[in-house]
Amino acid sequence: MTDAHLADRFARAALARLPAEVSDWLDQDVVLDELRKALTAAVAKRRDDAFVARFHARCPVAGASDDDYRSVEVTIDGRAVLLEPRFKGLDPGKSFIEVVAHEGPADAALFRGAMDLASERWSVFKPRALRTVVWPSAPEGIAANPDLEVVAGTTTAICERVAPEAARNLEMVRITDTSGFERFARAYQRFVDGHPVLRDELWIPDEATFAKVVEHGHSYDVEVEGTWVGLIAAVPAPFMGARGWIIHEELLDESARGCRLAAPMQRGLIERLHADRAGVVHGTIHHLNVASLATARRVGRDVIGRHLFLPLGSDA
């Protein structure tokens, strides 16, 4: 089977697994084309010797060879599955195996077979779990630990909702340069320090990354009565071939938390995005970031899928 043929089969299966409400946002032909492109590259990577050599050098594990860092296509219950080794935070001691693509439904038989194969094929890494994306939840009979929640909503539907009210009047001021980066970085560090459970899931962008976000034109300082209380920023990012946006940064400083500002701030950003270019506002939020998930739901960005870790060696 050629890479293109396998990628097409994976793409059609992935499209079929999408929830109906998500499919309604999308042009099916465009989505299928985008999935084919991404999956053709993923399928070809399993023969990319240069990539696996770089991967090995970046995450060295005693006793491992370059081939151990290679993705593999396997057959489980008559279905093709593409598995790939990963390391959380590029830490060689935190290995997991990613289900990159598969044919057919996301059912217990497929995941059990993948878990058995992953444990054997990559035993040198001692992987902790198999990771997969499900729409919207894991099949019954499989033990799963939550990771990231996939949240999304269209700007059109969000802007048609009644806007959430803020307890205090807020103003959003467009950012045009990086002069406020240090203030933002300090506030972000205070947030990280105050939420140790999220420490491994949060990354403060450097100034160069911040500058690139600002260039897209939708970065805003948030002020209350002239006092800076936070920042919110979005960048354009297609959603399965549809026009879309990702909220790249969203932060309220300590003094502004608990003041019912988060949802109005996010709604204000989305109204500006909609006026610029209607589309899907999407992204991922860690399941422990309860406040951010609540804000997303208040605005109209619902959980449509989940990244799950399926523990290896469990009774699942």
Give the role of each language-model region.
Residues 2-55, 163-206:
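Short amphipathic alpha-helix that is part of the acyltransferase structural core
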Residues 151-162, 302-316:
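Conserved catalytic-core motifs of GNAT/GCN5-like acyltransferases
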Residues 109-120, 252, 258-275, 293-298:
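Conserved acetyl-CoA-binding loop-helix of GNAT-fold acetyltransferases
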Residues 45, 53-85, 215-232:
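Conserved beta-hairpin
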Residues 98-108, 248-258:
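A short, internal acetyl-CoA/4′-phosphopantetheine-binding micro-motif in the GNAT/acyltransferase core
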Residues 137-152, 287-305:
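Conserved active-site alpha-helix within GNAT-family acetyltransferase domains
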